[in-house]
C-alpha cells in the first residue's frame, strides 16, 4: 500500500457505489480526493438489481462502457406480482428508453470493485482496508445528550486505522463525504439524527441458488428479475439472476410477524426461509424449479432508516450512510449514485465560489431528501397493496394486471426522473407522486370513492369548483385526492430530472471541467404544467378512463 497522504481537499469515507462515484466525479474535476474504505475489495454486499438510470449516471464519469463489457446479466425490465389472483405487472426499460436502455443485475463484490478502481483511474487516491475511526472538528458545537446536532462544527481531519497492521494515522481535509454505508459515522456518531422507519420494520432472509428456470423464456422479457407478494400478505420475495450462474432469492417480511411465525413453527432461519418459499411464494418457487440451494441463509433487519439532514457546511452524506428505504424497487444504488453526484456537484460549486457552503450543503440535503421521499412514497404504496391483496390499491377493480399502475411508476422505478434530461419526467413523476399519495391514503368505502369522483367531475363541468351533496366521508375522499394532486402546480413543488432540478435558485451544471451549480435561468411562461402552463384541472384514471379531478385554479 502506498502512503496515505497527510492532507487532501476532499476525504471520502467509504468506497462503495456512492463514495466511489462521488470520488470519480470530483477527481475528474482536478480536485485532490482521497478515498478510505474499511473493507478490502472485493467484498460482499447485497443489492444486486440495478435501475435503468444507472447507465446515464455511469456515463457521466465514463464508466458505463466497463459495465457493458463486463458480462453482467442485462436487465430489460422487472416483473412485479402483487396479487395472487392477477398476472404480474411489468416495467419495461427498453420500451421506455430504447434497445440500449437496459440495466444490469450485478454481483456487487465485482461491480463495486469496478467502481472503486475507476475512482482511482479517474485520479482519486484510493485505499481499502483502512477504516475511519473518528472525525475532528474546528470549534465543535455541543448539544444536550439525546438531542441531534445538525452542525457539529467544521470538520477538519479524520483518524484512521489500517486493518492489516493496526497502524493509526490522521488525514487533514477541507471537505468530507461520508459514504460509510450503514455505519453512517456522521449521522450516528456526530449528528445523531438517524431515525428508523417503523412502517418498514422488516427482516430480510436470502441466499443463492443454481440451476433455476428463467422468467418469460423466449420473450423480450426473458431472464428479468421477478418479485412476488407473499400470499399471506406478510411481505414479498425476490428472484434475481446473476452472471455467475446463481440466482439471488430473498424474502422480506414484517419483522414482528416473522419472529412470531418462526417461534410458532419452531424453525431456525434456514428452515423458515425455505418454508416461506415453499408455502406462500408459489410463482417464485416455480421459477426455482429443480434448482439447488448453494449458500447459507443471510439475514438483515432494521435496515430502513433516514435522517433529518444529509449535510452541514464542509460535509456531505451519501447513499446508505444517510438513508435506506427497502430492497423493493431497487432504489439503494440509485440513491447512492444520485447523492454521490449531488455531493460532488455542490462541493465543486463551493470550491469554485459559485455558492457559499451554507447554500451548497443545503442544496445537497434537499436534493437527497427529494429523491428519498419520492421512492419512499412508491414503496409505501406498494406495501399497502402487498399487505391488503383483497383491497386493490394500485389497480382498478376491473383490471386483471398492474400494467397501468406501473406505467405511472415507470419514472421512479427506472430512476429516469433523476438521471435523464427528459421533458416528460416532470409530468410522469407528478403522476407517480399523485398516484402514490392516492394509494397511501385510500378511501375504504367504494361508494364514497365513486361519489367523490362524480362530484369532482361535476365541479369541473359546472365551473364553480363546488362539490354538491357530499357526506363528510365523501368530502374527506375529495380532499385526500386533491391534496396530493396539488404537486402538479409550480407554486407548490417542481421536481425535474437531476440536470434541471432547481433548488434555492440553482441548478446543476453537469459538464466535465465545470461541474457545479449555476443560477436558474428565467423560464418563459408558468412552470406548473408539463407544457409550461398551470393545469386548471388535474386528472385521474378511473376504471380505465381519464377523469378530470381538480377544481379550477384561482
UniProtKB/Swiss-Prot annotation:
The UniProt record lists the keyword Flavoprotein: yes
Positions with a binding annotation for chloride: 331-332
Induction or repression: Expression is induced on AF medium.
**Pfam families, alphabetized:** FAD_binding_3
- What does this protein's UniProt record list under function? Flavin-dependent halogenase; part of the asc-1 gene cluster that mediates the biosynthesis of both ascochlorin and ascofuranone, a strong inhibitor of cyanide-insensitive alternative oxidases and a promising drug candidate against African trypanosomiasis. The first step in the pathway is performed by the non-reducing polyketide synthase ascC that produces orsellinic acid by condensing acetyl-CoA with 3 malonyl-CoA units. Orsellinic acid is then prenylated by the prenyltransferase ascA to yield ilicicolinic acid B. Ilicicolinic acid B is further reduced to ilicicolin B by the reductase ascB.
Question: What is this protein's name?
Answer: Flavin-dependent halogenase ascD
Family (UniProt):
Belongs to the flavin-dependent halogenase family.
Q: Name one GO biological process term.
A: secondary metabolite biosynthetic process
Keyword line: FAD, Flavoprotein, Monooxygenase, Oxidoreductase
Q: In which pathway does it act?
A: Secondary metabolite biosynthesis; terpenoid biosynthesis
* SUPFAM superfamilies registered for this protein in UniProt: FAD/NAD(P)-binding domain
- Which EC number applies? 1.14.99.-
Question: Binding residues for FAD, per the UniProt record?
Answer: 15, 18, 48, 333
* Applied relevance: Ascofuranone is a specific inhibitor of trypanosome alternative oxidase (TAO), and quickly kills African trypanosomes in vitro and cures infected mice. As an essential factor for trypanosome survival, TAO is a promising drug target due to the absence of alternative oxidases in the mammalian host.
Gene3D superfamilies in the record: FAD/NAD(P)-binding domain
Instruction: Answer whether the UniProt record assigns the keyword Glycosyltransferase to this protein.
Output: no
**Which molecular function terms from Gene Ontology are attached?**
FAD binding; flavin-dependent halogenase activity; monooxygenase activity
Q: Which reaction does it catalyse?
A: ilicicolin B + FADH2 + chloride + O2 = ilicicolin A + FAD + 2 H2O + H(+)
Amino acid at each position: 500500500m502506498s502512503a496515505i497522504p497527510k492532507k487532501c481537499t476532499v476525504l471520502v469515507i467509504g468506497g462503495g457505489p456512492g463514495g466511489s462515484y462521488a470520488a470519480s466525479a470530483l477527481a475528474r474535476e482536478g480536485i485532490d480526493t482521497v478515498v478510505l474504505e474499511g473493507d478490502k475489495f472485493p467484498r460482499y454486499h447485497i443489492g444486486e438489481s440495478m435501475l435503468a438510470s444507472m447507465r446515464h449516471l455511469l456515463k457521466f464519469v465514463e464508466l458505463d462502457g466497463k459495465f457493458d463489457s463486463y458480462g453482467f446479466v442485462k436487465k430489460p425490465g422487472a416483473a412485479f406480482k402483487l396479487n395472487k389472483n392477477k398476472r404480474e405487472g411489468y416495467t419495461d426499460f427498453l420500451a421506455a428508453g430504447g434497445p440500449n436502455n437496459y440495466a444490469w443485475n450485478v454481483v456487487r463484490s465485482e461491480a463495486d470493485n469496478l467502481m472503486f478502481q475507476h475512482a482511482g483511474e479517474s485520479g482519486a487516491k484510493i485505499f481499502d482496508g483502512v477504516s475511519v475511526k473518528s472525525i475532528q472538528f474546528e470549534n465543535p458545537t455541543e448539544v444536550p445528550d439525546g438531542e441531534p446536532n445538525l452542525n457539529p462544527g467544521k470538520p477538519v481531519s479524520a483518524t484512521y486505522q489500517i486493518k492489516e497492521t493496526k497502524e493509526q494515522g490522521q488525514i487533514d481535509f477541507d471537505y468530507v463525504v461520508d459514504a460509510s454505508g450503514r455505519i453512517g459515522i456522521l449521522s450516528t456518531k456526530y449528528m445523531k439524527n438517524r431515525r428508523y422507519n417503523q412502517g418498514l420494520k422488516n427482516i430480510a432472509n436470502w441466499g443463492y441458488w443454481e440451476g433455476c428456470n428463467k422468467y418469460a423464456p423466449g420473450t423480450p422479457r426473458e431472464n428479468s428479475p421477478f418479485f412476488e407478494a407473499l400470499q399471506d400478505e406478510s411481505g414479498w420475495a425476490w428472484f434475481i439472476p446473476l452472471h455467475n450462474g446463481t440466482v439471488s432469492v430473498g424474502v422480506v417480511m414484517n419483522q414482528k410477524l416473522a419472529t412470531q411465525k418462526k417461534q410458532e413453527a419452531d424453525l431456525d432461519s434456514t428452515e423458515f426461509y425455505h418454508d416461506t418459499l415453499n408455502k406462500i411464494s408459489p410463482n417464485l418457487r416455480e421459477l426455482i424449479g429443480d434448482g439447488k440451494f448453494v449458500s447459507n441463509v443471510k439475514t438483515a433487519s432494521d435496515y430502513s432508516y433516514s435522517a433529518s439532514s444529509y449535510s452541514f457546511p464542509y460535509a456531505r452524506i451519501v447513499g446508505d450512510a444517510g438513508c435506506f428505504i427497502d430492497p423493493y424497487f431497487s432504489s439503494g444504488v440509485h440513491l447512492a449514485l444520485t447523492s454521490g453526484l449531488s455531493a460532488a456537484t455542490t462541493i465543486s460549486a463551493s470550491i469554485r465560489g459559485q455558492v457559499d457552503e451554507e447554500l451548497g450543503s443545503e442544496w445537497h440535503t434537499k436534493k437527497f431528501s427529494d429523491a428519498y421521499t419520492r421512492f419512499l412514497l412508491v414503496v409505501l404504496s406498494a406495501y399497502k397493496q402487498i399487505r391488503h391483496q383483497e383491497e386493490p390499491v394500485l389497480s382498478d377493480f376491473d383490471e386483471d394486471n398492474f400494467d397501468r399502475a406501473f406505467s405511472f411508476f415507470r419514472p421512479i422505478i427506472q430512476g429516469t426522473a433523476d438521471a435523464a434530461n427528459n421533458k416528460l419526467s416532470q409530468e410522469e413523476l407528478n403522476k407517480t407522486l399523485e398516484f402514490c399519495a392516492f394509494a397511501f391514503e385510500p378511501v375504504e368505502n367504494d361508494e364514497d370513492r365513486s361519489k367523490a369522483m362524480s362530484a369532482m367531475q361535476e365541479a369541473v363541468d359546472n365551473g364553480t369548483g363546488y362539490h354538491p351533496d357530499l357526506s363528510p366521508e365523501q368530502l374527506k375522499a375529495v380532499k385526500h385526492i386533491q391534496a396530493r394532486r396539488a404537486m402538479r402546480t409550480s407554486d407548490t413543488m417542481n421536481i425535474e430530472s437531476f440536470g434541471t432540478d432547481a433548488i434555492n435558485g440553482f441548478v446543476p451544471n453537469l459538464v466535465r471541467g465545470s461541474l457545479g451549480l449555476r443560477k436558474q435561468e428565467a423560464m418563459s411562461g408558468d412552470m406548473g404544467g408539463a407544457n409550461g402552463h398551470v393545469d386548471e384541472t388535474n386528472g385521474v384514471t378511473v376504471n380505465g378512463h381519464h377523469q378530470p379531478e381538480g377544481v379550477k385554479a384561482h
